[in-house]
Amino acid sequence: MVAVIVAAHGHLAEGLVASSAMIAGPQDDVVAVTFDPSEGPDDLLAKYAAAVEASPSDQYLILADLFGGSPYNAAARFAAARDDADVVTGVNLPMLVEVLGRRMLGGNLAELVEVASTAGANGVKVKFVDRKSVV
């Protein structure tokens, strides 16, 4: 099974993991990695190592919040040193829920990367409201 690590600035990752459990049910091997203002890249690398230790798996998917942000940069360094990890940025709730659903069906790392990319983008919708009809 692919372990999923959700990494974000502040405590967003914890909120995403908790919210996904409301929708998809509690999941094994889903870890939130937080990043506080007092922390640096080495702290994040240590947190990724701890997440892997806490959720031993064949493969790891790290879903980071922002391309170029510290959680992503550290995740990219972490994954580059391994053969069993990939990183996708722009994590949102639709992305996480879809990834967990596909994982429950036995999806491998490559499949989950594709699902994450597609679901993350498709989860963003714009609903135009006819403001003239709104009172």
Locations of regions flagged by a protein language model:
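N-terminal intrinsically disordered, cationic/polar leader segments
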Residues: 2-31, 35-47, 73
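Short Gly/Thr/Asp-enriched flexible loops that form oxyanion-binding sites at enzyme active sites
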Residues: 71-81
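Acidic beta-strand-to-loop metal/phosphate-binding motif
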Residues: 59-65
